[in-house]
Amino acid sequence: HDGCHFSYEGYKEFANRILPLVSRDFYDENTSSIITPPQLLNTYYSGKKEITLTFDQKIKIEFEYEHNGLKHLMKDQFFFSFDNRKPFINKVIEKLEFKNDQIIIHLNTNQKFLNITWLPNKDYLNTNDVYNGPWITGLNNNIGALSFDNRSINK
């Protein structure tokens, strides 16, 4: 995609992903599989330098994505703030891990943040390259997670 338009294959994939939702919502079809994107339910400090994000389904994350010879790390796609202003602080994550429906963020600082954002920009930071990953996706359906902006981190 070019940041706005998809190729034929992209629109075909979009149709394949939306069909189960339309079938459920407009035609009362039942499904035995998860057909929705992962949605963040809770964010809390689970340790002195650890934040846990809990989603509504099992997830997986891409730890890195290489584009034009540059590695883009998932841990650099999260932003934090100390107050209710827009989160802008990044590069404070030592490592990430995921387990079932959770992402565990290990911080490299003792600072306590109030809010967190995972909202990839149209372009990678400080580039004109369209964002193409890394992603958070559903483990069983491979649908990209809903981004979240300025979510409170519970103590």
What are these regions (language model features)?
Residues 88:
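Aromatic- and glycine-rich beta-strand/loop motifs that create alpha-glucan
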Residues 120-137:
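Short acidic/polar inter-strand loop motif in beta-rich domains
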Residues 91-113:
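A surface-exposed beta-strand-loop module
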Residues 2-54:
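Histidine-centered active-site loop/cap adjacent to the catalytic His
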Residues 113-120:
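Short, aromatic- and glycine-rich surface loops/edge beta-strands on solvent-exposed regions
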Residues 108-112, 133-155:
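Mixed-charge, low-complexity segments
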Residues 47-76, 80-84, 107-109:
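A short glycine/threonine-centered beta-strand motif
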